[in-house]
């Protein structure tokens, strides 16, 4: 039940990311936003593999742990990118309106990465409980 809830949360926050991009229509998406989107994609792939491997929990213990570690590593990488993105926005963006738009979008992207990381934690707790 907890896994289904967190997966639903991941989908919701990724959907909100797209909605904010469409709603705010920023003049451009910066390099850091693209890097965060790439991390979200990679994190979702790791979650997909981990959820698939939950079906054979006893046989895939090592692979599951590896996926959970990779999800955590991606989240840590995203933290650095997020900090750089926010600093760059305040340093380089001259339009207050664009700054607010990109700050909101970047924060939502970071939330998506954090939800994916939470999914990894739930998967790891299932692994500990049933392995």
What are the residue ranges of the model-derived segments?
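Cytosolic, long alpha-helical scaffolding segments
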Residues: 1-131
């Amino acid at each position: 039940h907890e896994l289904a809830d967190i997966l639903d949360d991941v989908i919701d926050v990724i959907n909100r990311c797209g909605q904010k991009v469409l709603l705010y229509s920023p003049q451009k998406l910066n390099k850091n936003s693209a890097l965060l989107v790439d991390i979200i994609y990679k994190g979702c792939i790791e979650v997909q593999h981990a959820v698939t491997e939950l079906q054979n929990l006893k046989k895939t213990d090592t692979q599951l742990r590896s996926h959970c570690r990779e999800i955590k590593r991606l989240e840590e990488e995203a933290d650095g990118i997020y900090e750089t993105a926010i600093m760059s926005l305040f340093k380089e963006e001259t339009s207050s309106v664009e700054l607010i738009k990109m700050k909101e979008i970047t924060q939502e992207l970071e939330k998506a990465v954090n939800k994916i990381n939470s999914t990894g934690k739930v998967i790891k707790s299932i692994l500990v409980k049933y392995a």
